[in-house]
From Swiss-Prot:
Record family assignment: Belongs to the malate synthase family.
One BP term from GO: tricarboxylic acid cycle
Motif range (SKL peroxisome targeting motif): 552-554
Protein name stated in the entry: Malate synthase 2
Knockout-associated phenotype: Diminishes the ureidoglycollate hydrolase activity by 3 to 4 fold.
Organism: Saccharomyces cerevisiae (strain ATCC 204508 / S288c) (Baker's yeast)
Enzyme Commission code(s) on record: 2.3.3.9
Length: 554
């Protein structure tokens, strides 16, 4: 039996008791209460050993892929689950029946207000890839959500006043994305190890807000990222059951949409829904992370080298297969199949370019709607009307009733052949430019970064990094010059791009491009392949206090 106590628990961060966003009086002390900390410590002590074992399993699988011992296929041990037509996911929960347009963004206070005021049906509040996990971003994200759910998020800055346009019960449904299983929160140690960031984010939000959310006619809803095996989903389901039992909430009140954004998960979609069926609200196509994962898992195999990033689209064979399998699987099991992100942001000073960008969004959403998706993501409120217009053609709140007649094989999911594929010097430069810009902003505490009129998150930088690693490893020949991609070439272009970006930075000497390049260099020259950029850079952005807080005074 796990002991519910704060013994051997150390918090290396100040518990701020000063309100930061008048007129709200909410402070960090209202989030990091003794009861809330005991709750997340209980979850950590109960489930962290399982989490660590599942992460070790990921490493073991990668070793087998690298050696050629394992090739992806559907799991023989779960064939019975796939072949049983009788089981279904949960019926759509209150506030999650119509999900035709979902906006996403980090839990910054101004972004929360803007997203909740947008003409969308749901809002995915993101502690993961569009957030840089500084202590301030993570803990004040909890403060901001606490206030939003209680209609007390309105605030003023010297330049602008932010106000919700209506009662929270009539605004877009909140869905929170915690950090992935691979991340930890190093400001809170339990039994001499950092707490799982997933449990930290989920636990604080759930403990403080679950009952309030039910009161307003919604519920505690989540997006679950980066999972690579159905047993990782089972772990979430076990946590949900314990969490609901702990606060006296009926099981099944929580709902979770799982992002299918890793290659292993694409072979386990049915098992993933099955493991969380009591709490399932569907699956989502996490397109950029899926490309990243495909390269990451198959990086040692020359037949799976992908071309310039702009040539890898949702109509590429392996992407098209994964989308069609996802929609078919979700609708057969009675849950939502959500489309991917439109990352475009308005181009205010160029009407012609803006029109072209918006047409690209419209065509992308039309493709998704026709394929059978029940809704899709946008990164900016200006894109919401386009998404709404397209998905209004469903004629219903969703199209779960429509089960596309498709048969997707394991070979289809691994078909990375792309017509007219090429790698060019410009492709190298684009990857380095985007990767450096994103990493530099992330190191300064911003995880949601406008680059070339697109709102980028960590997945974009991950694609940049792993493509360059793959091109160097396999000595890809450049279409424009006939030269091989070598460590020397990528290092040379990296230095050029770093100097160019640093000299143009409005921050002057305070920019972090040199630091970003230091971490980027061994990755893009093929020397090392880190699991995630976010874990690689994490220690650069945290500032734990030297001494822990005295928790006995809470």
């Amino acid at each position: 039996m796990v002991k519910i106590s704060l013994d051997n628990t150390a918090l290396y961060a100040d518990i701020d008791t000063t309100p930061q966003f008048e007129p709200s009086k909410t402070t960090v002390a209202d989030i990091l209460t003794k009861d809330a900390l005991e709750f997340i410590v209980l979850l950590h002590r109960t489930f962290n050993s399982t989490r660590k074992q599942l992460l070790a399993n990921r490493s073991n699988l990668q070793s087998k892929l690298d050696s050629g011992e394992y090739r992806f296929d559907f799991l023989p041990e779960t064939e019975q689950i796939r072949n049983d037509p009788t089981w279904q996911g949960a019926i759509p929960a209150p506030g999650l029946i119509n999900r035709s347009s979902e906006i996403t963004g980090p839990p910054l206070r101004n972004m929360l207000v803007n997203a909740l005021n947008a003409e969308v049906t749901t809002y995915m509040t993101d502690f993961e890839d569009s957030s840089s996990p500084t202590w301030e971003n993570m803990i004040y994200g909890q403060v901001n959500l606490y206030d939003a759910i209680r209609n007390q998020i309105d605030f003023k800055t010297p330049r602008k006043e932010y106000r919700l346009k209506d009662d929270i019960s009539r605004l877009p449904t909140l869905i929170v994305r915690p950090r992935g299983w691979h991340m930890v929160e190093k400001h809170l140690y339990i039994d001499d190890e950092p707490i799982s960031a997933s449990i930290f984010d989920f636990g604080l939000y759930f403990y403080h807000n679950a009952k309030e959310l039910v009161k307003i006619g919604k519920g505690p809803y989540f997006y679950l990222p980066k999972m690579e095996h159905h047993m990782e989903v089972k772990l979430w389901n076990d946590i949900f059951c314990v969490a609901q039992d702990f606060i006296g909430m009926p099981r099944g009140t929580i709902r979770a949409t799982v992002l299918i954004e890793t290659l292993p998960a694409a072979f386990q979609m049915e098992e993933i829904i099955y493991q969380i069926r009591e709490h399932s609200s569907g699956l989502n196509c996490g397109r950029w992370d899926y490309i990243f994962s495909t390269i990451k898992k198959l990086r040692n195999l020359p037949e799976h080298v992908l071309p310039n990033r702009d040539l890898v689209t949702m109509t590429s064979p392996f992407m098209d297969a994964y989308v069609k399998r996802l929609i078919n699987t979700c609708h057969r099991r009675g849950v939502h199949a959500m489309g991917g992100m439109a990352a475009q942001i308005p181009i205010k000073d160029d009407p012609k370019a803006n029109e072209a960008a918006m047409n690209k969004v419209r065509n992308d959403k039309i493709r998704e709607m026709k394929n059978g998706h029940d809704g899709s993501w946008v990164a900016h409120p200006a894109l919401a009307p386009i998404c709404n217009e397209v998905f209004s053609n469903m004629g219903t709140a969703n199209q779960i009733y429509f089960v596309p007649d498709v048969h997707v094989t394991s070979s289809d999911l691994l078909n990375t052949k792309i017509q007219d594929a090429q790698v060019t010097t410009e492709g190298i430069r684009v990857n380095l430019d985007i990767g450096l810009q994103y990493m530099e902003a992330w190191l300064r505490g911003s995880g949601c970064v406008p680059i070339n009129h697109l709102m980028e998150d960590a997945a974009t930088a991950e694609v940049s990094r792993c493509q360059l690693y793959q091109w160097v490893k396999h000595g890809v020949v450049l279409s424009d010059t006939g030269d091989k991609v070598t460590p020397e070439l990528t290092a040379k272009i990296l230095n050029e791009e770093t100097a160019k970006l640093a000299s143009a930075s409005p921050l002057g000497e305070k920019n972090k491009f040199a630091l970003a390049a230091k971490y980027f260099l061994p990755e893009v020259t093929g020397k090392i392949f880190s699991d995630f950029l976010t874990t690689l850079l994490y220690d650069e952005i945290i500032k734990p206090s030297a001494k822990p807080v005295d928790l006995s005074k809470l």
